[in-house]
Regions:
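Conserved redox-active cysteine motifs that mediate thiol-disulfide chemistry
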Residues: 71-87
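Structural microenvironment flanking redox-active thiols in thiol-disulfide oxidoreductases
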Residues: 83-122, 136-141
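N-terminal targeting signals for export/organelle localization
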Residues: 1-49, 184
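Thiol/disulfide oxidoreductase modules built on the thioredoxin-like
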Residues: 133-180
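Hydrophobic beta-strand anchors of alpha/beta hydrolase catalytic cores
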Residues: 68-69, 100, 155
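Short pre-active-site segment immediately N-terminal to redox-active cysteine/selenocysteine motifs
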Residues: 65-67, 72-75, 107, 151
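A short beta-strand-turn-helix
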Residues: 46-66
């Protein structure tokens, strides 16, 4: 009997620890202000959805600017591991002819809240675009030497006629090496 009572108390205690909302003195449920703030802040960030054609045009530009295009998703651990390296490079190369673009292609449902919140949190609002991956076809993947859309992160580098591609997460050293080799 003691085990049953003890088990019930433990379950009740654990269940009460999960506080999503609380009731005020009048018995009206209220929501945690940080939850409201995060949703409000995410709503303020308006990310741009672009077409496959626009993305291909951006990937194909051949001029003196270095274009670094990273395909990612907010739920992807390896993608998130390399974001600090990209942020550091963006800051370091500010004012130089380098354009960083992050393409969120997966989980369209996250485009309303998770991706904008991520963009705001990482100060990447001006670097993230949204592309519906379901519209990618063989023609789209023909723009890459190796990538067929089978994994992320994937980073495409282009300056003039030179291109580099990296499938998988990059270390800071590898990112620096790729960028420096194309900026020469």
């Amino acid at each position: 009997m003691k085990k049953i009572i003890l088990s019930t108390l433990v379950v009740f205690s654990l269940a009460s620890c999960k506080k999503e909302s609380q009731k005020n003195e009048e018995g009206v449920a209220t929501t945690d202000s940080t939850t409201i703030l995060n949703k409000t802040e995410a709503a303020k960030v308006e990310l741009k959805e672009i077409s496959q054609q626009n993305l291909v045009e951006n990937l194909s530009k051949k001029n003196d600017t270095l274009y670094v295009t990273n395909f990612f998703a907010t739920w992807c651990g390896p993608c998130m591991m390399e974001i600090p390296h990209f942020k550091k490079k963006i800051e370091e190369l500010k004012g130089k002819p380098v354009k960083f673009t992050f393409v969120d292609i997966l989980d369209k449902a996250a485009w309303k809240d998770k991706v904008p919140a991520f963009a705001r949190e990482n100060n990447l609002e001006n670097h993230i675009v949204l592309v519906d991956e379901s519209k990618f076809d063989d023609t789209f993947f023909g723009n890459f030497k190796t990538w067929k859309g089978n994994g992320i992160p994937f980073t495409h580098f282009r300056k003039g006629d030179k291109t580099e591609e990296v499938e998988g997460s990059m270390s800071e050293e590898m990112l620096n090496e790729k960028i420096n080799s194309l900026l020469k």
